Amino acid sequence: MPLVNAKDMMQKAMEGHYAVGAFNINNLEWTKAILQTAQELKSPVMLGVSEGANKYMTGYNVVADMVKAMIKSMNITVPVALHLDHGTYEGAQKALLAGYSSVMFDGSHYPLEENLAKTRDIVAKAHFLGATVEAEVGTIGGEEDGVIGRGEVADPEECYTLKGTGIDMLAAGIGNIHGKYPANWQGLDFDALKKIKARVGDIPLVLHGGTGIPEDMIKKAISLGVCKINVNTECQLYFQEATRKYIEAGKDLEGKGFDPRKLLAPGTDAIKEIVKIKMEMFGSVGKAE
């Protein structure tokens, strides 16, 4: 099945009251694990790629070609969107030209008018190519590829204004952060989410920083209009822990345990484990049947 944009999967998620997971990929193993899990669980999925990960994997074209080829060779039949995560103005255009089916243009650090102008331009180019666009209001806290945000709560009026640019998905800050949540985190601001949803209407909402948010908060956010949830750090932590245990147990010194395919297997299996947990939590299992 070829790549799809996020429009149809977001619409179905909104109507079905579930969310689609957007899981960041960092290499072939990451991609393989997420695609396998989505196929096994019959779940739609979005593969998120940060600009840093694109650079690590040597470029947008390499990532797009790899994902497309893997979908074909693995006989993946569930809907898969390849999505640029927190893209710059320049990065979003590069991703679109490389064949990404969805992009996030993060202009939240620009003055509002400049953000709106740049967003309109990205929307026009993306829609011409059949791709979808996500935009953000209210900086998400934590760190994302070296960019540190303060975890602002989005202004409903700014959300409404940004919706007017023609975007397909809206990421609105509601106290969520990237990375690990600190012990003193106050939780998601559901009052703010309700106000945003009331103002923007039927546009699918996006929750960034899905790592470590309690299940009850996740489910409540979905009930209030969240249709896409980003997960990155949690996959990294599961991968790291499984790989560390393999090495600490001396498995890499047994036979050909040093073979990269064996060395990376426990971490890859761990990614599948957490992706399954998240897909079940988000309610997307079986929604691609």
Labelled PLM ranges:
Residues V4-K12, L28-A53, Y60-T77, H86-I203, ...:
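Alpha/beta enzyme core
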Residues F23, N27:
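Conserved phosphate/anionic-ligand binding catalytic regions in large, soluble enzymes, centered on
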Residues I247-E289:
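Extended, intrinsically disordered, low-complexity segments
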Residues G209-I213, V231:
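Short acidic/histidine-rich active-site segments
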Residues V4-G21, G257-D259:
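Generic N-terminal amphipathic, Lys/Arg-enriched alpha-helix
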Residues D85, H208:
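Active-site glycine-centered loops adjacent to acidic/histidine catalytic or metal-binding residues
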Residues L237-Q240:
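Short, solvent-exposed beta-strand-terminating loops
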